[in-house]
Amino acid sequence: MLNQIKQDAQTRMTKSIDALRHSLTTVRTGRASPALLDNIKVKAYGTDTPLNQVASISVSEGRSLVISLFDKGMIKDVEKAIYASDLGLTPTVVGTVIRLNLPPLTEERRKELSKSVHGEGEDAKVAIRNIRRDANQQVKDLLKDKQVTEDEARGAEDDIQKLTDKAIKDVDEVVKGKEQELMTV
């Protein structure tokens, strides 16, 4: 029973860290990455469709992205979606492909993005602490129902705290790595 609670807590904490990593892939750094465009939705065939489902996106020359559409009639829709996104990118249509040149980030924009990354890291830490609280509550409920001894409950709470400390350390490392990536010119 206690092992199940600890495993569940660990799984949920790992998912929180993975969600943070995925969320941070959409934060623009100095390098071009197809993941930058993951959140862009295009009006396609009457519905909002993720850009990566209507086009292939590749990196060209380090600082630019090339979008090759599967349906050439959607160029205007994709262009409109890129303008509407909050990435500050200007699409250039070259024949049947769209090029996105990523200008270097200004120092001010880097600091803004760094704050945003830090904030997302804090949100992940809060989620992890909530998971710890839920797990500890489950342990206390078992103790109250006399399904475990006090020593077993205390040991489980210590293990849950160790899991929490490790998860928060992992979040700090992910955030620190992304901030370093942002500050590298």
UniProtKB/Swiss-Prot annotation:
Pfam entry (one): RRF
Keywords linked to the UniProt accession: Cytoplasm, Protein biosynthesis
UniProt record, GO biological process: cytoplasmic translational termination; translation
GO terms for cellular component: cytoplasm; cytosol
GO terms, molecular function: ribosomal large subunit binding
InterPro entries named among the record's database cross-references: Ribosome_recyc_fac, Ribosome_recyc_fac_dom, RRF_sf
SUPFAM superfamilies for the chain: Ribosome recycling factor, RRF (SSF55194)
Domain of life: Bacteria
Main localisation: cytoplasm
Cellular compartment(s): Cytoplasm
Database matches in PANTHER family: MITOCHONDRIAL RIBOSOME RECYCLING FACTOR PSEUDO 1, RIBOSOME RECYCLING FACTOR
Family to which this protein belongs: Belongs to the RRF family.
Free-text function comment from the UniProt entry: Responsible for the release of ribosomes from messenger RNA at the termination of protein biosynthesis. May increase the efficiency of translation by recycling ribosomes from one round of translation to another.
Name this polypeptide is given: Ribosome-recycling factor
Organism ancestry: Bacteria, Pseudomonadati, Pseudomonadota, Gammaproteobacteria, Lysobacterales
Gene: frr
